[in-house]
């Protein structure tokens, strides 16, 4: 485990067993977001979060576009605790003998924020309070099959931030009129 409770981030590796179990995450509170990958297979990255509909029962795939999907073999339909997260018996992120990696995130006031929002289809958009000016933002629709978008304050250093990259494909940077982050 490599962790920093100050920044709310840990990197955890383990050897898969295909048995229901738990993995220590090294943070002092339950992670808000976990991104896990079997490093020895072509299986998709699994993303679990309190903010995905039916939290920890449904996952999203970082390298794919589907909406949140019911998958009990990833996190065993169980929310993380202050010390561990759960694994199901499937091969997706628990393949017997394979090395698995997980990136665990906690929201830290004034530093990082994991959350969700409901769009309002207005020109002004939805106001999302983070308590600070984010340097990096990920966006993924959990209800529909859309890409994962990221934007940052280096590509778009001023208001409005509308230059995006995709996390799930190799498209070049694009500028969107519908992505106007202040």
Q: PLM ranges: what are they?
A:
Residues 1-182:
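Surface-exposed molecular-recognition determinants
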């Amino acid at each position: 485990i490599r962790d920093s409770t100050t920044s709310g981030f840990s990197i955890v590796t383990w050897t898969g067993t295909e048995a229901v179990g738990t993995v220590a995450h090294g943070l002092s509170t339950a992670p808000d977001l976990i991104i896990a990958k079997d490093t020895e297979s072509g299986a998709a990255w699994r993303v679990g979060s309190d903010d995905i509909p039916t939290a920890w029962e449904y996952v999203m795939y970082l390298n794919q576009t589907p909406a949140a999907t019911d998958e009990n073999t990833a996190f065993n339909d169980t929310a993380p605790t202050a010390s561990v997260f759960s694994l199901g018996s499937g091969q997706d992120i628990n393949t017997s003998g394979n090395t698995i990696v997980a990136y665990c995130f906690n929201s830290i006031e004034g530093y990082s924020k994991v959350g969700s929002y409901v769009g309002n289809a207005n020109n002004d958009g939805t106001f999302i309070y983070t308590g600070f000016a984010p340097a990096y933002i990920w966006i993924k629709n959990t209800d529909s099959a859309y890409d994962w978008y990221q934007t940052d304050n280096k590509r778009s250093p001023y208001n409005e931030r509308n230059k995006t990259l995709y996390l799930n494909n190799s498209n070049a940077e694009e500028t969107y009129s519908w992505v106007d982050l202040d």
